[in-house]
Amino acid sequence: ADPTSGFIKDNEAEFTYIQEQTGKQPAIRGIDFLTYHLDENGELSYQDYAAERAIEWTNKYGGIATICWHWSVPSSTGNYAFYVESANANYTDFSISKAVTEGTKEHEIIMKDIELVASKFQMLEDADVSVIFRPLHEAEGAWFWWGAEGPEPCVKLYRLLYDQLTNVYGLDNIIWEWTGYTTPNSAAWYPGDDVVDLIGYDKYNVSDGIPNPSAIASTFYGLVASTNGQKMVAMSENDAI
């Protein structure tokens, strides 16, 4: 298939606009591994060439690609989704607790998906492309399946994912980022200093539907303090800036 198809050009629209208006490309570009999950036939249901686009962009512009993964899993209704029922009409009731338990159908499903994304990261490594990877993002918000059952299974899944990609598949081109918060329960969600390189914060500061451009510096300083200043802190998503 042609990675320069119409769909791929749509993915480039915002970056083309920025280039046209400023003459420059952003130094960091976010790419989603959204389509990297296997269906009931063990195949990709859709392909948007995210890994290939990351390689092309970083090689062409010399920037840094940051990867998130809206990880779709099956629901008992037969569809694939990443939201829970309370968050979106297209939802999954997939159990993360079962997914981190060996011998379950859910565990088999996630291990096959991890194998798939490992092959994509290997593709990146073979092209000498290192990336920031931000898996299981916004877990504490509980609107995605990986945060729906509390911190313990989420931490287990993050550490499983880290172990598989780093130790089993031998990948060393990944900078690991965790989406942090500053609530009283945030420490319980933190996977651990040994498996996190960066702390990210997704800044959506909306009141009455209107984004607030406040820097909310106290939140970012709180994240710095949460790891005693040992981890860099990034704004990993944002509305107004």
Predicted regions and their residues:
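Aromatic-lined carbohydrate-recognition surfaces of secreted/lumenal glycan-active proteins
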Residues: A1-D2, R134-L136, E140, Y158-N185, ...
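N-terminal module-boundary/linker segments of secreted carbohydrate-active enzymes
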Residues: A1-D48, I55
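Solvent-exposed loop/turn segments at secondary-structure junctions
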Residues: D2-S5, L34-H37, W71-P74, H137-G141, ...
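Alpha-helical scaffolding within the catalytic cores
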Residues: K9-I18, Y49-E52, L116-K120, T179-P191, ...
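Extracellular/periplasmic catalytic domains that process cell-envelope and extracellular macromolecules
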Residues: E20-K24, W57-K60, L124-D128, Y169-L171, ...
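Structural recognition of the beta-strand scaffold that forms the well-ordered cores
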Residues: P26-F33, I64-W69, V131-P135, I175-T179, ...
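Substrate-binding cleft of extracellular glycoside hydrolase catalytic domains
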Residues: L34-L171
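Glycoside hydrolase catalytic-domain groove-lining segments
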Residues: T183-I241
